[in-house]
Amino acid sequence: MVAETGTGLFSAHKITEELASTSLDSGVHLLFDIHDRTFQALPDFLAEHRYQEVNDIRNTVFQKAFDTNLSIYEYLVHHPQLQAHMQDAMKLHQPEGDWLSVFPADEIVGNQQTAPDPARVLFVDIGGGMGQQCIRFRERYPDLAGRVILQDIPQTINRVPKPMPNGIEAVPHSFEDPQPIKSKSPRLDNLARERL
């Protein structure tokens, strides 16, 4: 967990830094404060709904677990600390790999561009939280012409530091509403998480 770099001198290993991060702390809060409670309600919820698919964001296991008619997003508006934990936890490093290393945007987009169009929509991250994937996309492909757009509910977009780096646009939008931005490559960030 720590390395001795000299007599009486120590430094943290990467794992120690990860364990001490705000993102991991927030992830632990989400596990205990939301997920555990939701998982405990899941068997009864599934039985009550005869194990059928549920497509109503206000009729999920979350409502049963928290005894509310609010969607998780509406609920979080009234519980800002939980909302902050959710946004911070979304910044956790994904150990299964980096999607940017397997998605060659420069090749795909570069082959489609005869003349770079800075007004063209390049990337939309739907439900992208604090914009970490948009930022990583722009850092990886700084020379690709086009707009990079972060979409999330207004309560989340209001927490995003402004202005965003590299011209990234933060736009309030619920994925339940029709998509106003047309793009060939939207990214719905971890859809399974959205359907809690």
Curated annotation (Swiss-Prot):
Annotated residues for binding of S-adenosyl-L-methionine: G127, G128, D152, S174, F175
Spans annotated as Disordered: 166-196
Compositional bias per record (Basic and acidic residues), positions renumbered to this chain: 186-196
Annotated Gene3D superfamilies: Vaccinia Virus protein VP39
Transferase recorded as keyword: yes
One GO BP annotation of this record: methylation
An example Gene Ontology molecular-function term: methyltransferase activity
Applications (biotechnology): Diterpenoid pyrones display various biological activities and FDDP C shows anti-cancer and anti-HIV activities. FDDP C also shows inhibitory activity of 42-mer-amyloid beta aggregation that is involved in the pathogenesis of Alzheimer's disease.
Pathway connected to this protein: Secondary metabolite biosynthesis; terpenoid biosynthesis
Domain of life of the native organism: Eukaryota
Keywords assigned: Methyltransferase, Transferase
InterPro entries in the record: SAM-dependent_MTases_sf
UniProt EC number: 2.1.1.-
Described purpose of this protein according to its UniProt entry: O-methyltransferase; part of the gene cluster that mediates the biosynthesis of diterpenoid pyrones. The first step of the pathway is the synthesis of the alpha-pyrone moiety by the polyketide synthase dpmpA via condensation of one acetyl-CoA starter unit with 3 malonyl-CoA units and 2 methylations. The alpha-pyrone is then combined with geranylgeranyl pyrophosphate (GGPP) formed by the GGPP synthase dpmpD through the action of the prenyltransferase dpmpC to yield a linear alpha-pyrone diterpenoid.
PANTHER family: O-METHYLTRANSFERASE DOMAIN-CONTAINING PROTEIN (PTHR43712:SF4), PUTATIVE (AFU_ORTHOLOGUE AFUA_4G14580)-RELATED (PTHR43712)
Family per record: Belongs to the class I-like SAM-binding methyltransferase superfamily. Cation-independent O-methyltransferase family.
Protein name: O-methyltransferase dpmpI
Organism: Macrophomina phaseolina (strain MS6)
UniProt lineage: Eukaryota, Fungi, Dikarya, Ascomycota, Pezizomycotina
Gene (UniProt): dpmpI
